[in-house]
């Protein structure tokens, strides 16, 4: 148990630690100039107890900083992190979660007894795994630097943490206002002087610990004014900050694509020490739709001897960081001794390493790596090969609440409602799902801001609980490195195979999860007990349906997954290939139009061949989604499911759109205008595909939150063919009966003829159907311009219906079926031209009641509206009976709104519209 110290005890500790304590007012607060790197420290600062930096060479800090905006990791995740860091020969963990309110927003508050016990346990676990635990605090939001009470409060807080067993600390002043309060302006000549003063004082008060980090407000090249080499702020830091204190730096930008050696030499010169890199290359807290599973890249191993350390600030989702941390470890170990490139002995460009790199990059979109010590593609394959083993290990949180990505904390008046403290893992946060991608007008201005944008990252639906089932490692005579090396060498011995193009068979999995109670929003697979395991398993008979057997995740699945969620500034090779193919198919779709003049058979064949290959690539994404959804390791699934769900949904739409392009009869020049260059907008690969669809601004249709319980169910949306007519009529009849309870047994086609027959016969170009493994279960029909469509109906469809259905006698009271028959013999009302100018397209859509996934309807509507807008439509409308509450609600959820009554509107229907 830890007790708070009294003010008297604190003052006594201060007097003991500081033989000559600095005054808290006047110029005496500004420290003397720090010696240049390599010079002796005349005051002896930093050499206390023989552990200061000046007392000898300090080890290279390499590991992880938990420094993102969003829900912090829980204690058991951090313990698992320590285990992995030790296994991969990394050595450092920096505790700096932005949304632990006692770390940043309410930094003055002391930790409670329960929180203290958890922190002590965590620090002890780090020591057990030989990981250096660095505790960071961020007082810069509201501290008054010249107030002695504020300084004492900060000391008291760090004193408490030091009593937990922590020996390494960091003061962070990132993402704060540069302006000082009036009281500080009277004492300090600049903001930098104020920060350096308190940092030096705290550093000396703590006994000049061996590891003490300082994060400046100008922590990257783009934040330095007027430049890195001429920044007065950095110059003050370099001259005044004591030499035993290390400086954190993110590189040229907040999220740096590359960190050149020259840039590090430039900043090292002005801050008079080698920096510690806070690397945001895998941080995803600035974009709710992105996940980064690509390798550590854009940092030459030549940097290692020029740095004091590298700490990666990775994805918010803990389990998604396997590749990020593993490849960082590979990068670090490739030049662990800090050997400069000019002394690395290589025989020629045909060395073994070079040959392996060339093999890995053959046929890819990436340039051949020039770093002879480290290949990102080799490192990625190493990481994925080892990660694959984790997917087959049953592992999940043992408590009821489970981490599930896909939501973010609520925001009121622009202020995030942050998760209260991370140390207490039972906090429940009110959440809403992620925002959809913005349209073309909302282009990202400037660079991603992993540290500056205080916006909640997409959060789990529920707080992860305290306990993780520990994975058991097999005790083998061989070391982990030996086993991994053998696996990778065996993989490398195989020839690089082209992408598998076999279409995946999609089957609905039998969910291993138990049914949820309605008042609980958790999603957890039940753990199998010994009693359950001992029960005799059911064995189906020869004529019974065989048991469902889930296919395991493959290395190819993980390679595809990494390519789809690669790095901030680039997509992986397969992802980039899919994007290019869709762009080409979209731009050249006119060659397969029925109305295309002067057809070129070779171009048509090329288009159809490339379209078929693109559909096969989409099928690979669906197969990957199915296998990931069925994997044994639910912990990994819960962290990544929303992202995989998102890419699966958009690829389903894109595939359907390509199929529509291949069978339509109209061409459209309008559709080919406005291509956007890749990498220009937010949202990752899914965002790129969304912006290539005609209705890219229909954010509500692309906003498809995943189900609370993960499912591997996949639906297919495809163009309608005449052979589908009976199935569409059946759905139309069953859903109409369900809505009003009026069977049409004597005239089974009547309701279909009335609602959808004309569209199916005269507007094939704009008709889609929904399929699952049992067949067609939905339809989405439309016509781009209702005026000529009505004329065609009067010429061909209506006469056919009049012949098929005899006009009933109007003298008697008519049944519902007879009223429909009579409508074929009556003159149809024509909608006003003023209305049709804005809503020229007619749509009809419905889905069978057995389909419970709400995202399916959005995808179907997106496909239908894309086809209409691609051919010039400005808006669409539908006609609904006023008493059909189900279908009214159905269309309303799809973004349709009721059009105000105007002269010429039919009296017995409600007209809903949607602008395009």
UniProtKB/Swiss-Prot annotation:
Its EC number is 3.2.1.169. Detected in spleen (at protein level). Ubiquitous. Expressed at highest levels in the brain and spleen. Optimum temperature is 37 degrees Celsius. Less active at room temperature and shows very little activity at 4 degrees Celsius. Loses activity at 57 degrees Celsius within 5 minutes. Coiled coil: none annotated. Pfam families: NAGidase (PF07555). It catalyses: 3-O-(N-acetyl-beta-D-glucosaminyl)-L-seryl-[protein] + H2O = N-acetyl-D-glucosamine + L-seryl-[protein]; 3-O-(N-acetyl-beta-D-glucosaminyl)-L-threonyl-[protein] + H2O = L-threonyl-[protein] + N-acetyl-D-glucosamine. The modification Phosphoserine is found at residue 364. InterPro entries: Acyl_CoA_acyltransferase, Glycoside_hydrolase_SF, Glycosyl_Hydrolase_84, O-GlcNAcase_cat. Proteolytically cleaved by caspase-3 during apoptosis. The fragments interact with each other; cleavage does not decrease enzyme activity. It is an enzyme of class 3 (hydrolase). One of its GO terms (biological process) is positive regulation of apoptotic process. One of its GO terms (cellular component) is cytosol. The record marks 413-414 as: Cleavage. One of its GO terms (molecular function) is beta-N-acetylglucosaminidase activity. Optimum pH is 6.4. Activity decreases sharply at pH below 5.0. The keyword Magnesium does not apply. A protein binds at residues 67, 98, 174, 219, 278-280, 285, 313. Residues 60-336 form the GH84 domain. Inhibited by Cu(2+), Hg(2+), Cd(2+) and Zn(2+) at 1 mM. Not inhibited by Co(2+), Mg(2+), Ca(2+), Mn(2+), Fe(3+) and EDTA. Also inhibited by sodium chloride at 1M and 2-amino-2-hydroxymethyl-1,3-propanediol (trishydroxymethylaminomethane) at 75 mM. The active site is at residue 175. Residues 1-50, 440-480 are annotated as: Disordered. Belongs to the glycosyl hydrolase 84 family. This is Protein O-GlcNAcase. It comes from Rattus norvegicus (Rat). The lineage of its organism: Eukaryota, Metazoa, Chordata, Craniata, Vertebrata. The gene is Oga.
């Amino acid at each position: 148990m830890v007790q708070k110290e009294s003010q008297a005890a604190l003052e006594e500790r201060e007097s003991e630690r500081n033989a000559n304590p600095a005054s808290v007012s006047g110029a005496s607060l500004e420290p003397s100039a720090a010696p240049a790197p390599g010079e002796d420290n005349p005051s002896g600062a930093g050499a206390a107890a023989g552990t200061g930096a000046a007392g000898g060479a300090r080890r290279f800090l390499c590991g992880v900083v938990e420094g993102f905006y969003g829900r912090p990791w829980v204690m058991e995740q951090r313990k698992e992190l320590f285990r992995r860091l030790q296994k991969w020969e990394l050595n450092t963990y920096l505790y700096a979660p932005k949304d632990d309110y006692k770390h940043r927003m309410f930094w003055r508050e002391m930790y409670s007894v329960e929180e203290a016990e958890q922190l002590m346990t965590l620090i002890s676990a780090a020591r057990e795994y030989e990981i250096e635990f660095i505790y960071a605090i961020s007082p810069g939001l509201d501290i008054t630097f010249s107030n002695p009470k504020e300084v004492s409060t900060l000391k008291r807080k760090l004193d408490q943490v030091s009593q937990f067993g922590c020996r390494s600390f960091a003061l962070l002043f990132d993402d704060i206002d540069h302006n000082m309060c009036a009281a500080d302006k009277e004492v300090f000549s600049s903001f930098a002087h104020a920060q350096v003063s308190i940092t030096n004082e705290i550093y000396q008060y703590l006994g000049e610990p061996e590891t003490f980090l300082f994060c400046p407000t100008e922590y990257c090249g783009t934040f330095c004014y007027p430049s890195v080499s001429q920044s007065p702020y950095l110059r003050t830091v370099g001259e005044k900050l004591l030499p035993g204190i290390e400086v954190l730096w993110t590189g040229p930008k907040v999220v740096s694509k590359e960190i050149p050696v020259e840039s590090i030499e430039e900043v090292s010169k002005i801050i008079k020490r080698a920096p510690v890199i806070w690397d945001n290359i895998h941080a995803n807290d600035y974009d709710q739709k992105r996940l980064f599973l690509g390798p550590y890249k854009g940092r030459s191993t030549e940097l290692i001897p020029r740095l004091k350390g590298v700490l990666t600030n990775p994805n918010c989702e803990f389990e998604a960081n396997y590749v990020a941390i593993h490849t960082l470890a590979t990068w670090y170990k490739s030049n662990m001794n800090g050997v400069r490139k000019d002394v690395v002995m290589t025989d020629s460009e045909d060395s073994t390493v070079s040959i392996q790199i060339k093999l890995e990059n053959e046929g890819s979109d990436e340039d051949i790596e020039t770093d002879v010590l480290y290949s990102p593609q080799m490192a990625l394959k190493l990481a994925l090969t080892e990660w694959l083993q984790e997917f087959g290990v049953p592992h999940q949180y043992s408590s009821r609440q489970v981490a599930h990505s896909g939501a973010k904390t609520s925001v009121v008046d622009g202020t995030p409602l942050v998760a209260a403290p991370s140390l207490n893992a039972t906090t429940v946060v009110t959440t809403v799902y992620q925002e959809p991608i913005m349209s073309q007008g909302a282009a990202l201005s400037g660079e991603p801001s992993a540290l500056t944008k205080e916006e909640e990252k997409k959060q789990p639906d529920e707080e992860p609980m305290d306990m993780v089932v520990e994975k058991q490692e097999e005790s083998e005579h061989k070391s982990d490195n030996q086993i991994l090396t053998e696996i990778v060498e065996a993989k490398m011995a195989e020839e690089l195979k082209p992408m598998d193009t076999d279409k995946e068979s999609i089957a609905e999995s039998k969910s291993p999860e138990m049914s949820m109670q309605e008042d609980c929003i958790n999603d957890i697979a039940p753990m199998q007990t010994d009693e359950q395991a001992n029960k005799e398993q059911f064995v189906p008979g020869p004529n019974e349906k065989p048991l469902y057997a889930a296919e395991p995740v493959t290395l190819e699945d993980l390679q595809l997954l990494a390519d789809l969620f690669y790095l901030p500034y680039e997509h992986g090779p397969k992802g980039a290939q899919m994007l290019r193919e869709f762009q080409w198919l979209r731009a050249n779709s006119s060659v397969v139009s029925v109305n295309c003049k002067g057809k070129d058979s070779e171009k048509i064949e090329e288009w159809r061949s490339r379209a078929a290959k693109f559909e096969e690539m989409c099928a690979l994404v669906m197969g990957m989604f199915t296998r990931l959804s069925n994997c044994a390791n639910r912990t990994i699934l819960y962290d990544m499911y929303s992202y995989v769900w998102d890419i699966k949904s958009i690829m389903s739409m894109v595939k359907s759109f390509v199929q529509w392009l291949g069978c339509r009869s109209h061409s459209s020049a309008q559709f080919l205008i406005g291509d956007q260059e890749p990498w220009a907008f937010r949202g990752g690969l899914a965002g790129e595909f969304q912006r290539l669809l005609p209705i890219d601004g229909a954010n509500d249709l692309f906003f498809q939150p995943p189900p609370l319980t993960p499912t591997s169910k996949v639906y297919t949306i495809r163009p309608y063919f005449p052979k589908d007519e009976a199935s569409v009529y059946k759905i139309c009849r069953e859903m109409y009966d369900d809505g009003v309870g009026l069977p049409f047994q004597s005239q089974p086609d009547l309701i279909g003829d009335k609602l959808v027959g004309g569209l199916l016969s005269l507007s094939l170009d704009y008709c889609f159907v929904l399929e699952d493994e049992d067949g067609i279960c939905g339809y989405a029909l439309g016509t781009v311009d209702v005026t000529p469509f009505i004329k065609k109906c009067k010429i061909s469809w209506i006469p056919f219906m009049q012949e098929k259905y005899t006009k009933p006698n109007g003298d008697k009271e008519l049944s519902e079926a007879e009223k429909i028959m009579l409508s074929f013999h009556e003159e149809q009302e024509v909608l006003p031209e003023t209305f049709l100018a804005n809503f020229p397209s007619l749509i009809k859509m419905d889905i069978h009641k057995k389909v419970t996934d709400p995202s399916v309807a959005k995808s179907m509507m997106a496909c239908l509206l894309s086809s209409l807008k691609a051919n010039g439509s400005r808006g669409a409308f539908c006609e609904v009976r006023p008493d059909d509450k189900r279908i009214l609600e159905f269309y309303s959820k799809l973004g349709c709104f009721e059009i105000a009554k105007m002269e010429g509107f039919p009296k017995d229907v409600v007209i809903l519209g949607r602008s395009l």
